Amino acid sequence: MRHRILTLLLGLAVLVTAGCGFNLRGTTQVPTELQKLLLESSDPYGPLARSIRQQLRLNNVTIVDDAMRKDIPTLRIIGSSESQETVSIFRNGVAAENQLVLHVQAQVLIPGHDIYPLQVNVFRTFFDNPLTALAKEAEAEVLRQEMREQAAQQLVRQLLTVHAAEVKNTQKNGDKPVSDANAAQGSTPTAVNETTLGEPAVSTSAK
């Protein structure tokens, strides 16, 4: 009897969470037209590309491996860079606290329309103990992986701003592709910058 009651309660919990639009933490409702993408990267098997690929799949985005496809959007990873700077020092002048910064640049290419730039900055700080060099390196590597995962999450979220800008451009040009509208006016298409998207470059700080 008790087992049946527990089963019933679990079933009700599932129905309630499904009915209220419950989503897994960290997931984004990616627009339908961006749920199928090409993913381009100069290092497709590197740790950043793997993190981005994983986040796309977690958000129900299908990654198409056919690079010849020209009818679906492309998420292109332009590049990434890491830097480290000293935040505080000990009395003897040795670094006590460091800050890691991960900068990622990407863009979304919509076939027949425009190119939308994306930018992410992720920050992490950690204490530098000169007596535990090996532990310090291990901690830094863990932080770098967490930063890559967070950057990937932020890139996926920025797909929402791409969708909003695309809808705005389509309405502005009378439901015509941006490139066609610009051609009719005798001008070349220009890339949409961060301010046009209505959202500045994402900068996430977590300590």
From Swiss-Prot:
Topological category with respect to the lipid bilayer: Lipid-anchor
GO-annotated biological processes: Gram-negative-bacterium-type cell outer membrane assembly; lipopolysaccharide transport
Main location: membrane
Listed Polar residues bias regions: 182-207
Single GO MF annotation: lipopolysaccharide binding
Cleavable signal peptide: 1-19
Covalently lipidated residues, kind N-palmitoyl cysteine: C20
Entry keywords, A to Z: Cell outer membrane, Lipoprotein, Membrane, Palmitate, Signal
Pfam family, one: LptE
Cellular component GO terms held in the UniProt record: cell outer membrane; transporter complex
Lipidated sites in chain (S-diacylglycerol cysteine): C20
Localization in the cell: Cell outer membrane
Annotated region (Disordered), positions in chain: 168-207
InterPro entries: LPS_assembly_LptE
Assembly information from the UniProt record: Component of the lipopolysaccharide transport and assembly complex. Interacts with LptD.
PANTHER family in the record: LPS-ASSEMBLY LIPOPROTEIN LPTE
NCBIfam families linked to this entry: PRK10796.1
Known function: Together with LptD, is involved in the assembly of lipopolysaccharide (LPS) at the surface of the outer membrane. Required for the proper assembly of LptD. Binds LPS and may serve as the LPS recognition site at the outer membrane.
Family the entry assigns: Belongs to the LptE lipoprotein family.
Protein name: LPS-assembly lipoprotein LptE
Gene symbol of the encoding locus: lptE
